[in-house]
């Protein structure tokens, strides 16, 4: 089993089901591994920005880790605009970036670039694979990093020889980090604010905007009179008949000031103060 095959089985073990790909020659062993598998769906895109945008959308809507397969630094660069969006949305996305073989890097081929440097601005977690033997564990840790709640961008840079050399057995899924619970003191403070008679805004995002989350915040709003507002750019918002009304914060400051002019206090739920 070569590195690409063991890596793919490791990704499948971690719950990855779909790969949005725009590969080149450096990724052919990864393409071959996907082609042999009936557990990984591969979707070919003709532009890397489509790969990253589709991966972001899939991760948001399905709540599952999405996979991209991109060719070298230029391919990553073409995908970066939508990876920026995915990072801001905290979508669970794993990028597999092929690179020149370790022994070929020194020749500075035409498409050679600083892939690590290009990865940083659009990733929460970056790793450059050292060998075929470490690749399966690197892949398992990439999935683990991507699934840190509410989601992260994990980028794995894979030199071609690490994909085609003989490797070790696939790695089982690693434990996922549990959602951090609000501290008791923060809950007590929120309850006190909601009951002090002042006009309150609940600023919402992420888990607070799921169907279950909206049911809870609606109960709070009805009991306390709090106004419900969500971030201007929300990763996902459950909508439809029977759900509570949530205002989206205006993009321009003038709009937001009108929405917030009566507010005396604000409680952030799964988000941060508006910028």
Language-model-detected regions and their locations in the chain:
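N-terminal alpha/beta PP-like core and its mobile active-site loop of ThDP/TPP-dependent enzymes
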Residues: 1-275
